[in-house]
Amino acid sequence: FKWAFNDQVGLVNNILFSLTGRAQIIPWLIDVPLGFIALLVAEIWMSTPFMVIILEAGILSLPTEPFEAAEVDGASGWQKFRMLTLPMIMPFVYTAMAIRSLDLARVYDVVRIMTDGGPGNRTELIWTYVYRLSFSGHNFALGSAMSYVTVIISFLFTWYLFRNVLKSRWEGQR
């Protein structure tokens, strides 16, 4: 992705030049808002397939009987989605969100490789900041404390999501 967003020979600038005919160089990894856009595109590109597989597994595991009954009752496609599909795949959505929230620590390598937190540490995320603080700034105590707090926040978010999954399963068994 660093090569794709390179301002001189990058694929994105070449595609934009081919489409628009304007030879304007866009500094994707140097400009702050564009740097975040480039990081976001790279991260979405890398994480979307796994999330789609989880959600597709959830959709394929849905029972057909409620949908057939809704069809007989004359429910529209939107009503079937809102009243049947969405509530039944919510455990899979919560699981995907929990995995994704824990996977956010992996974003460190994308930021480190593409922008290294620059320009001026403005595309820095929590894990790159903890790394820079601990190893470049030699402040191991603060870096360790920040990483513990971040892990605890991730744990609490995951606990909240799984609590909702268990609550929805408990209500479904009643």
Language-model segments: residues:
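A structural signal for multi-pass alpha-helical bundles of membrane permease subunits
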Residues: 1-174
